[in-house]
Amino acid sequence: AARAPSGTNTQPWHVYVVHGEPRQRIEREVCAAHDAIRANPALAGDFRESYDYYPEQWVSPYIDRRRENGWGLYGLLGITKGDKDAMHAQHQRNFKFFDAPVGLFFTIDRVMGRGSLVDCGMFIQNVMVAARARSLHTCPQAAWNGFAKIIAPIIGMGEGELMVCGMSLGHADESAKVNTFHTPRVAAEDFTRWVG
């Protein structure tokens, strides 16, 4: 994974690998905060993302793809529109690392430019490919970003670091219904423009 390319070889990524008690503590504390926000939405302001992962205002075709993905997953799991309890429980699976024994948190130094997010993304993809080569499964998760202030002291993340995302690492339960869901993909013609 460390062979991922980066602009002028800056290699701006950091990765924290958690398991055992630190992983369990993160799960407990973030799930408690997630539940508290649900009970009192005003608390959400205390858990702001370090950067805008998603746009403030969604436009087509991105909102359409997001909805298709959500409807497909929730439909498979039997979660109906408006079932806030089931939606909350499903979202909270993120903060339980989807039952994986290992969690990873990826960061970059805040002084770096936005290009370092691209570099870190290539590093993250390499981690995922390397994991599959070893018969492991991964799930990259932006859901952790809003809870960096809980996670940072547990993992020893520096104040000058920006959390990019988290990731669950383990062996997928192939018998779980959720693992039969495959996210739809647009055709190559929809995102490729041949010039010349």
Model-derived segments and their meaning:
Residues 2-196:
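Acidic, surface-exposed loops and disordered segments
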